């Protein structure tokens, strides 16, 4: 496999020659440029979906042969044979998944039907099936994986689905599309789609891998693909990996993972340009982002200016609008020069209605912006003010997703408690300021505050917990878990911790839970046996007594097995917990008699001692 390494000799001459050779490749007219060309147009069929244009890239600077040229080498079955060919029939009836781009105003959460993509992921393992595929078939499959991965993540972050750690199916969609993307990337790298692969398909594959932060897989696939251009019988496959849309993903990953130096990134970028041909907005935006991260603000501003020029020529091109939005927030979150960053922040928060593109004020960029301001000496009062303005921006735009608010609240409280790990009059004053500046004191605000608060004083912690009642914020199951977890950092008595545990169980019961979930067991462990600040025999024995009392309330037999197996790593804990399996009613150094409330929904679901006996039998030396 070809490797580009950062050596004293710089880029390998072989790679440079590949880029120079690619610059002579055929091109197609671009939807974002007014440049005229005599090259053939992209003849890929379009969908009836109004979002199709988001994914169809008619590349002005393409380094690959036009899709129409590739298509002529594929023998598509005739209509008469298609009816008798079950593979062709399935390909023709494949229902592609779409997602709505972020910059589309009024976007709603997508409803995803995974059936067709699931079936395709299985069928594509069959060589005979792959041989029936066309370039369009492969692209539609890759685009479906990409869109589904985005939609599934949105559903999770927007809390349109209930994701319980004990429900294995809740992770299924994420793992399914991650596995599908990896499998498709491996098949492409292995040369299993020599006629079907195209630059637009590669872009979808790379972008999906990027969604899952699979940086090594991205670079390995790209380097393998570039190396393929050495083969005499592989046509333009190697050139496809030098397409601007593909490079827009690869170069960012290469920079972030330190695979290439900044200078090498610029050399690759400059060699990918073709005279008198436009640069794809995605590549312009990514090079701008990389420059901003590197502190090359002049180049970042140049990229923004070029994108604005493209916008003036084609103000409705979604690729340009999305690129403008992304490079704008990159200046906010990634620019270490806070004078520049604050100017873009002001534009986004106060003047967004006057911008030609929609600002997507992503929470991680906001947090990075606040951290940069803090690092360069901004007062906490000023940081709270900027945080409050962002919150108002989200409320005004109806973008108050729980995950987004938790992220920016976490960033704010981390700054506060890093400055004040111990309570003081000044710290208390600033914490009260966050309450005063918060326009919507809700569960997410209070949960995040308690999660990050390192203060151990029981009175101070109780004052914060009382804010749920003071501001009429109902405590959810998550709130009760967070309060219980935090008890591990507070000087509570075992009786007070038991009260918090009982409050959690009553909330579970009122919400219709039939079992005590793994997240609940994790919370009580952090409050007792895993307490770093106040670990004691009293807390340890309280935990053992709770497990003894509620051992059969776990979700099912498998949950009970996982519960005990997880304790094997700690010999002391395992020795005590295993007694609940091997002894009928064990007593501990300090015995707590725990009274079980009358539940309406919580119930015993397993015979814990019987189920977990296989674990203790397998590890007799640890008893």
From Swiss-Prot:
Signal peptide: none annotated. Its main location: mitochondrion. Residues 1-60 form a transit peptide. It is a peripheral membrane protein. Phosphorylated. Phosphorylation promotes binding to RNA. GO terms for biological process: sporulation resulting in formation of a cellular spore. It comes from the Eukaryota. It is found in: Mitochondrion inner membrane. Coiled coil: none annotated. The keyword Kinase does not apply. Residues 20-49 are annotated as: Disordered. Residues 27-49 have a biased composition (Low complexity). Keywords: Membrane, Mitochondrion, Mitochondrion inner membrane, Phosphoprotein, Sporulation, Transit peptide. One of its GO terms (cellular component) is mitochondrial inner membrane. Binds the 3'-UTR of mitochondrial mRNAs. Involved in the processing or stability of mitochondrial mRNAs. Belongs to the RMD9 family. Monomer. This is RNA-binding protein RMD9, mitochondrial. It comes from Lodderomyces elongisporus (strain ATCC 11503 / CBS 2605 / JCM 1781 / NBRC 1676 / NRRL YB-4239). The lineage of its organism: Eukaryota, Fungi, Dikarya, Ascomycota, Saccharomycotina.
């Amino acid at each position: 496999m070809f490797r580009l390494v950062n050596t004293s000799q710089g880029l390998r001459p072989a790679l440079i020659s590949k880029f120079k050779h690619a610059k002579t490749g055929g091109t197609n007219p671009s939807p974002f440029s007014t440049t005229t060309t005599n090259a053939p147009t992209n003849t890929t069929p379009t969908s009836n979906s109004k979002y199709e244009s988001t994914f169809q890239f008619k590349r002005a600077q393409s380094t690959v042969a036009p899709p129409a040229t590739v298509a002529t080498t594929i023998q598509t079955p005739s209509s008469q044979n298609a009816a008798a060919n079950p593979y062709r029939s399935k390909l023709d009836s494949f229902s592609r998944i779409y997602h709505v781009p972020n910059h589309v105003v009024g976007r709603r959460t997508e409803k995803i039907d995974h059936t067709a993509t699931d079936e395709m992921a299985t069928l594509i393992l069959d060589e005979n099936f792959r041989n029936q595929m066309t370039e369009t078939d492969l692209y539609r499959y890759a685009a479906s994986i990409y869109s589904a991965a985005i939609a599934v993540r949105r559903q999770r972050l927007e809390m349109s689905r209930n994701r319980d750690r004990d429900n294995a199916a809740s992770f299924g969609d994420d793992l399914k599309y991650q596995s599908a993307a990896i499998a498709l990337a491996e098949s492409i790298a292995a040369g299993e789609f020599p006629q079907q692969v195209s630059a637009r398909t590669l872009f979808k594959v790379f972008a999906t891998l990027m969604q899952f932060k699979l940086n090594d897989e991205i670079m390995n696939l790209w380097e393998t693909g570039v190396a393929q251009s050495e083969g005499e019988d592989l046509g333009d496959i190697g050139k496809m990996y030098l397409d601007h849309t593909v490079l827009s993903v690869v170069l960012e990953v290469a920079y972030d993972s330190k695979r290439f130096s900044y200078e090498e990134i610029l050399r690759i970028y400059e060699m990918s340009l073709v005279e008198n041909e436009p640069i794809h907005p995605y590549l312009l935006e990514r090079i701008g982002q990389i420059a901003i991260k590197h502190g090359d603000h002049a180049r970042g501003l140049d990229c923004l200016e070029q994108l604005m020029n493209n916008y003036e020529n084609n103000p409705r091109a979604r690729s340009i609008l999305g690129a403008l939005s992304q490079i704008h927030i990159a200046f906010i979150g990634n620019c270490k020069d806070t004078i520049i960053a604050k100017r873009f922040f002001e534009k986004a928060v106060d003047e967004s209605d006057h911008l030609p593109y929609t600002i997507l004020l992503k929470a991680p960029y906001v947090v990075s912006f606040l951290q940069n301001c803090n690092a360069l000496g901004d007062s906490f009062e000023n940081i709270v003010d900027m945080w409050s303005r962002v919150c108002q921006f989200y409320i005004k735009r109806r973008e108050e997703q729980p995950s987004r608010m938790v992220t920016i609240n976490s960033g704010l409280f981390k700054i506060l408690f890093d400055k004040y790990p111990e309570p003081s009059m000044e710290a208390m004053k600033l914490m009260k300021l966050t309450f005063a500046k918060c326009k919507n004191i809700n569960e997410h605000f209070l949960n995040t505050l308690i999660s990050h608060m390192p203060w151990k004083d029981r009175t101070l912690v109780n004052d914060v917990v009382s804010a749920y009642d003071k501001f009429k914020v109902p405590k959810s199951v998550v709130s009760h878990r967070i309060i219980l977890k935090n008890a591990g950092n507070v000087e509570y008595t075992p009786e007070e911790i038991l009260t918090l545990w009982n409050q959690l169980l009553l909330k579970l019961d009122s919400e219709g839970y039939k079992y005590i979930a793994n997240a609940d067991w994790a919370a009580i462990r952090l409050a007792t046996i895993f307490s770093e600040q106040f670990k004691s025999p009293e807390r340890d024995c309280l935990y053992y007594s709770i497990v003894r009392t509620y051992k059969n309330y776990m979700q099912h037999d498998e949950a009970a097995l996982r519960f005990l197996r997880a304790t094997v790593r700690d010999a002391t804990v395992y020795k005590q917990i295993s007694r609940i399996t091997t002894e009928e009613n064990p007593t501990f150094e300090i015995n707590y008699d725990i009274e079980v409330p009358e539940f309406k929904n919580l119930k015993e679901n397993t015979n814990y001692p019987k189920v977990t006996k296989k674990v203790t039998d397998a590890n007799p030396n640890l008893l």
